[in-house]
Amino acid sequence: ANPMAMNTWAANEIGKVNTIGLCHGVQGGAKLIEDSLNIPFNKMKYSCSGINHMTWYLDLKYKGKKITKEQLSKSLKKHKKFSRDEKVRIDVLDKFGYFSTESNGHLSEYLPWYRRTQKDVKKWSSLSNWIHGETGGYLRVCNEKRNWFLEDYSKYLKKSGINLNDYKRSTEHGSYIIEAIETGKKYRGHFNVINKKTISNLDEDCVIESTGYVSSKGLQMIEGIKLPLQCAALCSTSIDVQRMAVKAAVNGDVELLKLAVLQDPLVSSVCSSEEVWQMVDEMLVAQEKWLPQFKSKINSIKRNLKKIKNYKYSKAVKGITRKTKNNRQKRSVLVEKEAFNL
């Protein structure tokens, strides 16, 4: 799943670089809630805490009134688009009592219940957009945009006079953080940082995503937040995977890496321990040139793989996907707009 937490964790703990991870899931999820309830943009008050791609809207209010789980669930199920595209998020809301900031597809990557079989994937995913659970959707979209960039970007730059006034400021954190630091204007956002005292019922050394304020004095996180028990339990499972993965990557520890993959909720829902061991070996060999810390181990892995003949994995879970569009097809759907998310 997403490496945000692991990268932020490694940069802070191992690299000793003061690093803050930024994601746009909170803003996107808030707009989705506003749209489902017909609330004007940016008029809902909310607070979120958790881990990246599993952050929870702990409090939702509009005009001073609390938005309940029942209200939100009902509005999402009635909405033509969201009822089709957000089935995992709605199911988690109904069962756990809180709405997740993350998209339907990404949330399903952190849980063991929604991608076990092809039937599951078809039931809980949508092909309306890659973000809603399409198998390999991110790879497809990246390939399409890369192909467009290589062929058409130079032509795009030659267009005369791109007027920046035509574009509205996005909800991405970057420009607001710079504005806050340079002008002192306080900015409230949700940031990925080492937990410490921010969320009281998650480990202090892990990376969390929670509410903070940026000003000319820097970033100040709100401390003492306590997640609902059920939400903390889901987060803790992924935190353990992230901790093992970070230490395995930094130390070149193959065995710990395999245990991290084995512990992953989605992997463990479809793979046996033998399959995980074999899969990680094959992945290490395939990506050898980018993994110098594993070099001494990879040589012995190669020898072991040569000894294994006709290893059979369990029948693969077939997902659902769309075909990669070529450049001509992409032009017909305004690829410039899609590529730059304008």
Briefly describe each language-model feature range.
Residues 34-340:
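Long, compositionally biased stretches enriched for glycine and/or charged residues
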Residues 12-18, 64-65:
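A glycine- and small-aliphatic-rich helix-loop capping segment at beta-alpha/alpha-beta transitions
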Residues 7-8, 30, 280:
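Generic structural marker for isolated residues within well-ordered, non-membrane alpha-helices
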